């Protein structure tokens, strides 16, 4: 099993290397925020939003329905934070969820079958390393089954006005009945960031889980986005947090939050096939003065207080 997990981990790290390049380019568009810039990106669909006002600054096929990959986990984490306010509640990862996840080659945080962790551990495990086992465990804890939890996901999507979204699972694995759009994912993130627990998890770069028999030193986790960026600083600003995703059907996907010159932006992109273009966008679109971590957190507190 270790060989299989290590192989999966190497493949995931390769994808993550491509994703951070995409992030550096796409999410500081707010400095110029012009439609023709987005039209030139390799992302099939993208959207840039002022995260404070909700104003859409630029878009490209933002209403097109497409596979969201692991961006799905934003909804899973949001619902779990709403339903499970006691983050210290113990949860045992069901052994029966693992075979199907291994077979699907789903991304995993690294928890083991039968391991007992906390809700907090699972939230970070779902968001930072994109652990599918964490999503499945949270779904079971909230609703008793993934099917029942997915019904909650679709109900929440309807309440938020996500008209081009339908969920078929809580992890983002490819399914014909599992789709969303850049515009809908922007709406989801906008709503989720008003949840303090979600916001904290979304903007965290690294985390170590509670001690268990299987992990006597805890399980170290790093954000698939921020771990590739030195402190989140890129030319022109600071990436505060984000969620990456990849499947063959979805391509490279990203939802992220960045601050530039005191203004907070939400960026969403998917269907990207050419990581090189992300670097081109980074050099062509980013300018300004990078902010320190202190400025970043102060601005975020002011924005969401």
What are the functions of these language-model segments?
Residues 15-35:
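Sec-dependent N-terminal signal peptides of Gram-positive bacterial secreted proteins and lipoproteins
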Residues 14-18, 59-62, 91-95, 103-107, ...:
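A generic short-segment signal for beta-strand/edge and adjacent turn/coil regions
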């Amino acid at each position: 099993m270790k060989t299989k997990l290590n192989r999966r981990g190497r493949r995931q790290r390769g994808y993550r290397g491509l994703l951070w390049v995409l992030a550096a380019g796409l999410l500081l568009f707010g400095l110029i925020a012009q439609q023709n810039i987005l039209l030139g990106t390799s992302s099939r669909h993208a959207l840039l939003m002022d995260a404070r006002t909700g104003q859409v600054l630029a878009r490209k096929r933002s209403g097109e329905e497409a596979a969201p990959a692991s961006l799905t986990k934003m909804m899973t984490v949001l619902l779990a934070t709403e339903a499970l306010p006691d983050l210290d509640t113990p949860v045992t990862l069901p052994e029966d969820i693992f075979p199907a996840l291994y077979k699907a080659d789903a991304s995993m945080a690294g928890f083991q079958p039968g391991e007992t962790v906390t809700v907090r551990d699972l939230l970070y495990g779902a968001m930072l390393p994109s652990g599918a086992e964490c999503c499945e465990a949270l779904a079971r804890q909230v609703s008793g089954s993934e099917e029942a939890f997915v019904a909650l996901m679709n109900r929440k999507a309807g309440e938020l006005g996500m008209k081009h979204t339908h969920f078929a699972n809580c992890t983002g694995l490819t399914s014909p009945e599992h789709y969303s759009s850049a515009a809908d994912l922007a709406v989801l993130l906008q709503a989720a960031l008003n949840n303090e627990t979600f916001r904290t998890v979304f903007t965290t770069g690294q985390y170590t889980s509670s001690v268990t028999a299987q992990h006597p030193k805890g399980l170290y986790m790093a954000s698939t986005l921020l771990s590739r960026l030195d402190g989140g600083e890129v030319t022109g600003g600071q990436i505060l947090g984000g969620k990456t995703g990849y499947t063959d059907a979805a391509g490279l996907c990203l939802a992220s939050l960045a601050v530039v010159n005191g203004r907070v932006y939400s960026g969403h992109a998917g269907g990207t096939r050419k990581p090189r273009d992300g670097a081109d966008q980074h050099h062509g679109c980013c300018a300004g003065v990078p902010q320190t971590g202190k400025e970043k957190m102060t601005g975020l507190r002011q924005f969401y207080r």
